[in-house]
Amino acid sequence: MEVILLERVAKLGQMGELVRVKDGYARNFLLPRGKALRATAANRDKYEHMKADLEARNIAAKAEAAKVAEKIDGHNVIVIRQASETGQLFGSVSVRDIVTSFEAEGVMISRSQILLDAPIKTIGKHAIEVAVHPEVEVGVSVTVARSAEEAERINRGEDISTRREDQDAAAEAIAAAGEFFDPDAVQDDEEQPVEQ
């Protein structure tokens, strides 16, 4: 089916373009959401009359989206989840979880605006894209951690694979081993390796 796009649609075309799409995509998505009109002679005339109004609305929506984009550009949300010692999550962080985290901070974003290829399944800082308007995308980060303290460590760039207590214990063990090891010691004859 041929349709006339009333707004920019990702991976399809710009406003005003005449594009051929599958019938189901047009009937179930583009037409009901007001993103396109069937490409009939009457609708082509209708589009020409609506063109200036549509462009003005698009410019206003883009300006509003730019304000939201400026507010959230580089924003970091924290999601707390249970995870194994290796950093694998018990479950995953989905688009819904990210939207909930944004809403908790007072930023209203719909699930369809979050561009996430696959759910997040590991602890760490993950970069994602948010499409606040078909022509305006902004990068944000999602920090997934076991606790708020761990999230702060991740955001500071610290390595969370080893815990601070483990590092202190290792340093003490090395110091204790140094007390028992004499670098100037000479091997006794009894301790000489046997040559064969």
Swiss-Prot record:
| InterPro entries found in the cross-reference section | Ribosomal_bL9, Ribosomal_bL9/RNase_H1_N, Ribosomal_bL9_bac/chp, Ribosomal_bL9_C, Ribosomal_bL9_C_sf, Ribosomal_bL9_N, Ribosomal_bL9_N_sf
Q: Which cysteines are joined by disulfide bonds?
A: none
* One of the protein's GO biological processes: translation
Matching entries from Pfam families are given as: Ribosomal_L9_C, Ribosomal_L9_N
Cellular component GO terms, alphabetically? ribonucleoprotein complex; ribosome
Q: Does the keyword Protein transport apply?
A: no
SUPFAM superfamilies, per database record? L9 N-domain-like, Ribosomal protein L9 C-domain
The UniProt keywords, alphabetically, are:
Ribonucleoprotein, Ribosomal protein, RNA-binding, rRNA-binding
GO MF, one example: structural constituent of ribosome
Which residues does UniProt assign to the signal peptide? none
Entry's family note: Belongs to the bacterial ribosomal protein bL9 family.
Function, in words: Binds to the 23S rRNA.
Q: What is this protein called?
A: Large ribosomal subunit protein bL9
Q: What is the source species?
A: Rhodopseudomonas palustris (strain HaA2)
Gene name, please?
A: rplI
